[in-house]
């Protein structure tokens, strides 16, 4: 499970832990900060976080693996987040998700073989009036159809 981190990643993790360890219950905040800076929470960060926060490796690993939000591998160049909430489901999000998986050749929480696109589920983007919705690299899309999804992906240089 534990892999060595590059020195620059180790320094980043140590800095984040040092900056936040005095806050009450800092583990989630620390993990979010690590993912924000590195794009994911590497397995090699677990012992550094555990040591810095005086927790067991099992406690830190348990939190990282419990919350689907935390990535344990580097994300693709583009992150496509498909809304899975009820409003979007009622407007065809399930069919859109199946189309996206086929189009990209991945399941949720996976990245295309070329490292370009990661497909992630989210539970409400706040765009319910324009469902089904997705977000790509922070840009919100609404009223998606399979055709509009394909065009959205093509904008990213992904022409499958």
Model-predicted regions and their roles:
Residues 1-160:
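Signature of N-terminal electron-transfer/Fe-S-associated modules in redox systems
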């Amino acid at each position: 499970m534990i892999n060595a981190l590059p020195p620059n990643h180790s320094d980043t993790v140590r800095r984040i832990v040092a900056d936040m360890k005095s806050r009450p219950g800092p583990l989630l905040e620390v993990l979010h900060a690590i993912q924000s800076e590195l794009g994911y929470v590497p397995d090699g960060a677990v012992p550094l976080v555990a040591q810095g926060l005086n927790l067991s490796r099992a406690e830190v690993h348990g939190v990282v693996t419990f919350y689907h939000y935390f990535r344990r591998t580097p994300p693709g160049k583009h992150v496509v987040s498909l809304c899975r909430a009820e409003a979007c489901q009622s407007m065809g999000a399930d069919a859109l998700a199946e189309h996206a998986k086929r189009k990209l050749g991945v399941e949720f929480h996976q990245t295309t073989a070329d490292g370009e696109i990661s497909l992630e589920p989210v539970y409400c983007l706040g765009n319910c009036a324009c469902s089904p919705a997705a977000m790509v690299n922070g840009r919100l899309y609404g009223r998606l159809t399979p055709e509009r999804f394909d065009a959205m992906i093509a904008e990213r240089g992904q022409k499958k």
